Amino acid sequence: MDPQLPETDLVIFDCDGVLVDSEELSCRCLAEAMVKAGIEMSTERALELFLGRSTTALVDYCRGVGKPLPATFLPELAQQVRETFRSQLKPIAGIAAVLAELHLPYCVASSSDLERVKYSLELTGLASRFGPRLYTAQMVEHGKPAPDLFLFAAGRMRADPRRTLVIEDSVSGVMAAKAAGMKVWGFVGGSHYRLADGSALLKQAGADRIFAAMTDFWNEG
């Protein structure tokens, strides 16, 4: 038990927008790729629609607007995101210090695919902090906002959902954590929240606490 988190046995971190400052980068790549495929989209709109969601949500959206994605779309998008991350991705400021000070089991539960999570953590020097404790939407039937992924991660980590704390930056992620019966803190320090008021969105979704800098992680209240 960590004396600073007395009723918590496990901390689950989302990856994009919580560990790495990737949301604006990836949604910019997505918007550009969608426009190229003939689907109207902007970075801001992509953030509204797909923040914290899995690839399934993207595929379903495109089908819904009568523009099913070509077979080459997702592989080409993944490559573009990878190239963008290689030159521009940074860790969220202060996250390394939080992980170093955390004396509880912790893991990642992300809507991104496993290879992208691994790549993001390797680029930002965080991979060794998590080892194999990486759980993604590919591993469950229903992605966020369903609770499946967080319950799966807690099960793998042998933790009681009621004693699990989730750190999330998206509405769908906050909703998923609450549906899983977990405590959730909404983090709004990613660069994508320059474009929207994340605090109000995450609070409305059910976040138990909102904070905007990892230096405030331990300053609950």
Which residue ranges define each predicted feature?
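An amphipathic alpha-helix signature
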Residues: 27, 31, 47, 55-60, ...
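Helix-loop "lid/cap" segments that line or gate small-molecule binding pockets
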Residues: 33-34, 54-68, 120, 154, ...
